[in-house]
Amino acid sequence: MSLVYMNIMTAFMVALAGLLMYRSHLMSSLLCLEGMMLSLFVMASLTILNSHFTLASMMPIILLVFAACEAALGLSLLVKVSNTYGTDYVQNLNLLQC
């Protein structure tokens, strides 16, 4: 395994650890999710480029589309929660309150 793949896997693990540790604020959770999606995108792109597997060349673009949709939904949820409660604490998101 090359050094580039090790660095990308380390970036993914750091973002995952950040998501697990800093889950009190919604903004930090969204940033960690974006870091995870970015590292997955780079890993998929490098793997497809190195293996010359042209049939799967659309997979990184599809992953990028899902990351953009996730970011848009996350930011709209952040705006709604911060306008409603005044803070971005995840503990304010209770599905039973509706």
Curated annotation (Swiss-Prot):
It catalyses: a ubiquinone + NADH + 5 H(+)(in) = a ubiquinol + NAD(+) + 4 H(+)(out). Its EC number is 7.1.1.2. It is a multi-pass membrane protein. The keyword Coiled coil does not apply. InterPro entries: NADH_UbQ_OxRdtase_chain4L/K (IPR001133), NUOK/Mnh_C1-like (IPR039428). It is found in: Mitochondrion inner membrane. Belongs to the complex I subunit 4L family. This is NADH-ubiquinone oxidoreductase chain 4L. It comes from Rusa unicolor swinhoei (Formosan sambar). The gene is MT-ND4L.
